[in-house]
């Protein structure tokens, strides 16, 4: 309950040696003599809820979607749809958190274990003029971040996308500098897309690979007992 050794010594001097005795003490006395935190502990021991659910769950600071590749990726044509898949998935997570982001970062790297191969790490962050959770905005930013960090001649082993600098999705912030050619944010449209894709992905953006995580490393995945007829468990 957050009662450490030093605090225990002070409680023992007050003849409080167990949780039952602590629960019987007047919370106001505990607040005066010790702290608000310990007073809250006393109230919780009495069965009183002191924190709302919203206070207990801290909001995420960032969302990361990344994968290691089962086969090395050497060309931008293959890498683009992979990063697009990451951007779409990260956008879905962002909307589930009821947040918007102001930064989109993309990273790529070769395998640090392949000492005999040329090594390269690339990382780029795009600042958004206005916070968004619209997949289309995040896809555009991801593409802008990927192009300058890609280098031909390297065997890439991993890539990923990171969304950060969050704000509540109900907040509104406008900018005079937003590119008019960028798609307008439409929360209802994205909500509709999420509903359609709730169980199995049915709608893809043009920049995506329809095999969502290909060519990812999937040799250690668990059998799909509930979604694939060919992987149903067999009873002898």
Task: Report the location of each language-model feature.
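DNA-contacting surface of Y-family translesion DNA polymerases
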Residues: 12-153, 171
